[in-house]
Amino acid sequence: LTLETPKPLLKIKDTTILENCINVISKLGIKKILINTFHLGDQINEFIKMKNFEVDIKIKEDGKNILDTGGGIMNLVKDTTDQDFLVFNPDTLWNYKYVNEINEMQDFYFSNKLNCILLVADKKLSFDKSFNGDFKLKDNLLQKGEDNNFIYIGCKIFNKSLFENYNLKNF
């Protein structure tokens, strides 16, 4: 499926996964979106132009080599003065049901002056029962270890300062 179409442009019913993501972001009141691309990025660029969304969307390419998640995020934030970023995996199946949870996560992040927060779910709620889990919760902190009961579902908020000591590369 994704040899000729980037995963975010796959459709569920008549809407792409990326469009669902952008609609949720818009529902959150966010007016500026940065998108990092690599595989078939020209298709994503054309899709954004064609749809004419009501938010300001800037697209930045990885370049010759894929930067993966960390490098892709760094590629986006290195040239901006913004300090805090809400990051979505655009190949996650987002819908409006997540808006309340994301708003609660934002409120918690800013009221507690955090540097990073991840949106996680109990792995029992996943349709895919093969997940081992990404994290466990201990003393209100996510940790990796045995008995990981929570899965990262593709949304996080972080402060740009987390990337200060990294060079732009694949990570």
Q: Where are each of the predicted segments found?
A:
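Glycine-rich N-terminal loop/short-helix segment of MobA-like nucleotidyltransferase
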Residues: 1-13, 26-28
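A generic fold-level signal
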Residues: 4, 68, 80, 111, ...
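A structural signal for short hydrophobic beta-strand segments in well-ordered beta-sheet cores
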Residues: 9, 135-137
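Conserved N-terminal catalytic core of the sugar/cofactor nucleotidyltransferase
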Residues: 15-89, 93, 165
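Catalytic-core segments of class I nucleotidyltransferases/pyrophosphorylases
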Residues: 85-86, 93, 98-110, 123-127, ...
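Extracellular glycan-interaction surfaces
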Residues: 119
